[in-house]
Amino acid sequence: MNTIIPLLLLSLLITVYAYALEDGNKEEIQDIAESEFEASNEMLQLAHLLEADRAETEEDRNSRQKRCWGANVPCEDENSPCCSPLKCEKTFGYGWWYGSPFCVRSGSG
């Protein structure tokens, strides 16, 4: 009888300890599962951001500024695509020396 009581007490302590470990393992497994779920959400958000960035890049590519004509390039009329500070004007010598107007700075001629 003296040996049975300590053995029963020891077995009781072992089972209580095992249940405590099992609860801890369940919490760890649950934490791991939650972190994996968060990682998949982050990947999904990243995919949406990349898709939006790709669409924005496509828009930028299609809305590129049209090429313009540089200085002293012959042009047809005032609607010609001369670069920003330049305008299509009839310069000195237009008609008797030059056959068409040129892209020049405004007021220089």
Curated annotation (Swiss-Prot):
<keyword id="KW-0165">Cleavage on pair of basic residues</keyword>
<dbReference type="GO" id="GO:0005576">
    <property type="term" value="C:extracellular region"/>
</dbReference>
<feature type="disulfide bond">
    <location>
        <begin position="68"/>
        <end position="83"/>
    </location>
</feature>
<keyword id="KW-0800">Toxin</keyword>
<feature type="propeptide">
    <location>
        <begin position="19"/>
        <end position="67"/>
    </location>
</feature>
<dbReference type="GO" id="GO:0090729">
    <property type="term" value="F:toxin activity"/>
</dbReference>
<comment type="similarity">
    <text>Belongs to the neurotoxin 14 (magi-1) family. 07 (Jztx-56) subfamily.</text>
</comment>
<dbReference type="Pfam" id="PF08092">
    <property type="entry name" value="Toxin_22"/>
</dbReference>
<dbReference type="GO" id="GO:0019871">
    <property type="term" value="F:sodium channel inhibitor activity"/>
</dbReference>
<keyword id="KW-0964">Secreted</keyword>
<feature type="signal peptide">
    <location>
        <begin position="1"/>
        <end position="18"/>
    </location>
</feature>
<keyword id="KW-0732">Signal</keyword>
<keyword id="KW-0960">Knottin</keyword>
<protein>
    <recommendedName>
        <fullName>U26-theraphotoxin-Cg1a</fullName>
    </recommendedName>
</protein>
<feature type="disulfide bond">
    <location>
        <begin position="82"/>
        <end position="103"/>
    </location>
</feature>
<feature type="disulfide bond">
    <location>
        <begin position="75"/>
        <end position="88"/>
    </location>
</feature>
<comment type="function">
    <text>Probable ion channel inhibitor.</text>
</comment>
<keyword id="KW-1015">Disulfide bond</keyword>
<dbReference type="InterPro" id="IPR012627">
    <property type="entry name" value="Toxin_22"/>
</dbReference>
<keyword id="KW-0872">Ion channel impairing toxin</keyword>
